[in-house]
Amino acid sequence: MAVLNINGLSYVADAPADTRLLWVIREHLRLTGTKFGCGMGLCGACTVHLDGEAVRSCQIELADAEGSRITTIEGLDPKGQHPVQQAWSELQVPQCGYCQSGQLISAAELLDTNENPTDDDIDNAMSGNICRCGTYVRIKKAIKEAVELKKQV
């Protein structure tokens, strides 16, 4: 059993210590915005923030997450007003939408660490996120729009 801080709330997870964080979030806590893609940490669909850093939750064991601040897509901004969420919506980025929670979490980390990312910065930050629909051009455009939206806040 572990106590987790997810999206600012305390949760008790009754699961073995080696259970992957992804399954604790989705199956035990029913926060289903974080997606299962590959299970190997390669696609980025399961990305969450762990103490502010974008990580693949399918690669993190429950025991390693205990005591950390975890943010899922549900907690990025519960009202959907984070600059990346606004830009994604305004520019209609998603096609199927499956990868988008991981894309948004990765983009949010980029903007937290780099106020004015270059195209190369964006490519590097987002390189671990695969979009099977190929919306990469829209994703990059939305990140640039989010930079501008963040400046207005």
Please give the residue ranges for each predicted region.
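Signature of N-terminal electron-transfer/Fe-S-associated modules in redox systems
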Residues: M1-V153
